[in-house]
From Swiss-Prot:
Role this protein plays: Type II interferon produced by immune cells such as T-cells and NK cells that plays crucial roles in antimicrobial, antiviral, and antitumor responses by activating effector immune cells and enhancing antigen presentation. Primarily signals through the JAK-STAT pathway after interaction with its receptor IFNGR1 to affect gene regulation. Upon IFNG binding, IFNGR1 intracellular domain opens out to allow association of downstream signaling components JAK2, JAK1 and STAT1, leading to STAT1 activation, nuclear translocation and transcription of IFNG-regulated genes.
Glycosylation sites: 39, 106
Reported tissue expression: Released primarily from activated T lymphocytes.
Coiled coil regions in record: none
Protein name as annotated: Interferon gamma
Subcellular location: Secreted
Family matches, as InterPro entries: 4_helix_cytokine-like_core, Interferon_gamma
Annotated keywords: Antiviral defense, Cytokine, Glycoprotein, Growth regulation, Pyrrolidone carboxylic acid, Secreted, Signal
Recorded superkingdom: Eukaryota
Signal peptide: 1-23
Lineage of the organism: Eukaryota, Metazoa, Chordata, Craniata, Vertebrata
Pyrrolidone carboxylic acid PTM positions: 24
């Protein structure tokens, strides 16, 4: 019985690994299809350097990567939206969007819809500007949560029980 479970677990692992390879291979094929369609291997495309990749490599700290990744995903979603009527490349675009959906949005349709909704808000509309400024006081604490947590941790270690040599002496006496 134990051997049967081990074999089933092994088969499950192999199936998962092979499906991941298949999906990755399909994604690469679809990207290659887009490159061929747009003739993006041509020398004139390389002139002026990379459009997105250099920016991505400049943002390598753990907290920074999510910020720039969301902007890059937004860029590609806008690009795909502009190309949505092109039937010749629609399958490739759909495959790439599905991969972004699975990896960036954790397959959550609600997160994807919220993301797309944010990218489509018309920032030149006066009513939108007024609403956004009105909400800013509520939004900012959520956006700067990491910064305030770092400050709180730093304060805790230096005052009232942090790593002082003699904890019996008050911080004000040091």
């Amino acid at each position: 019985m134990h051997t049967t479970r081990c074999i089933l677990a092994l088969l499950l692992c192999l199936t998962q690994a092979m499906s991941g390879c298949y999906c990755q291979g399909t994604l690469i094929e679809e990207i290659e299809n887009l490159k061929k369609y747009f003739n993006s291997s041509s020398l004139d495309v390389v002139n002026g350097g990379d459009l997105v990749f250099n920016i991505l490599t400049n943002w390598q700290k753990a907290g920074d990567t999510k910020i720039i990744e969301s902007q890059i995903v937004s860029f590609y979603f806008k690009l795909f939206e502009a190309l949505k009527d092109n039937q010749a490349i629609q399958r490739s675009i759909d495959t790439i969007k599905a991969d972004l959906f699975a990896n960036f949005f954790n397959s959550s349709m609600e997160k994807l819809n919220d993301f797309v909704k944010l990218t489509k808000i018309p920032v030149n509309d006066l009513q939108v500007q007024r609403k956004a400024v009105n909400e800013l006081i509520s939004v900012m604490p959520h956006l700067s949560r990491k910064l305030s947590l770092r400050k709180r941790k730093r304060s805790r270690c230096c005052f009232g029980g942090g790593n002082r040599p003699n904890k019996n002496i008050l911080a004000s006496n040091i």
